[in-house]
């Protein structure tokens, strides 16, 4: 609503009183109401980029808005001095991390790789003197659940409420997560870490197959062709792997299938819950599924000689500390991976995920001194290259779909 000033020389309109200039100087000022970032005066979200008309805002809630108000004498507000980051003077100074976001993203990638490598190395060291993957899988999830419960207690983050409908959607996700996690650890305990990760490079193949034949989605021929090097590379590595055994191979394959169905059920269980709370609830559900088989398959052996043998080899303090830290590293690297995905584009995350697998395979070979044949090394390299090509093509297809939807 624009205000209009009637000059004293204008002709008066019949029926409308003539406005006279009041005594004293009237200064018209524009009052800028500064709200905190993202919040307005009532706590709602502010939609930036739109100017709210002053006449439509009733800042004084004790009285209704009057269409005709008496002129009020106000002092002229002196403009605030502009900050270094905003010439208008209405924004707070930009912090160092906000000014250089790539440093924060780089830190997330570093922590993701570091925690993942440490987890895989410590996990394999535990299996060298305590070969009970079902029990260790329970410890992984239990430490993470305790961590989540502690975080909820202090409100970092605030616990998201759940109802029976959400739980019905999350239970299949938690079951697939539990099955994939346990079978991965069975494979880690049975064969070399590098070989397990080479087999797990086939996971994109199972994802594509499930999308095509289970969900009925059309997979481009370019994606199928990019998976050929993955299958060939894993086959080459498996034929000459020195630590090969069928338990480790089949367990890793079941893990691939389980995580594929976890992805399918996750898409069906999409909620407005943030990733931290969502992963916490999935961990709790997965823990409940992991406890019965651990008690059934390994309980008697653990009580008979499992715990005593481990304590005799490394001592009780180291045994307990190893179990605690391997569980903590497992939870943190999964949480950091989720946070990293939220910060970068799918293409960047896909490349980072491939490089992470390369780091894990390389460091595990160096730390444990695993001897690999030339054919295994070539096959592993071909498989990793195929995963990289597949991830790049898939990420670009997803980006094109988002651009078409936004256009």
From Swiss-Prot:
Compartments (UniProt record): Plastid, Chloroplast membrane
Transit peptide, residues from-to: 1-81
Transmembrane segments: 102-122, 135-155, 213-233, 278-297, 376-396
Molecular functions per Gene Ontology: organophosphate ester transmembrane transporter activity; phosphoglycerate transmembrane transporter activity
Topology term for the membrane: Multi-pass membrane protein
Topology feature Lumenal, residues: 123-134, 234-277, 397-407
Gene Ontology, cellular component aspect: chloroplast membrane
Pfam families membership: TPT (PF03151)
Keyword Ligase: no
Positions marked as site (May be essential for binding and transport of phosphoenolpyruvate): 222
Keyword set, alphabetical order: Chloroplast, Membrane, Plastid, Transit peptide, Transmembrane, Transmembrane helix, Transport
Membership in a protein family: Belongs to the TPT transporter family. TPT (TC 2.A.7.9) subfamily.
Function: Mediates the export of fixed carbons from the chloroplasts into the cytosol in the form of triose phosphates. In addition, it can also bind and transport phosphoenolpyruvate, thereby increasing the photosynthetic efficiency of C4-plants.
Description of how the protein assembles with itself and partners: Homodimer.
PANTHER family: SOLUTE CARRIER FAMILY 35
Protein name in UniProt: Triose phosphate/phosphate translocator, chloroplastic
Originating organism: Flaveria trinervia
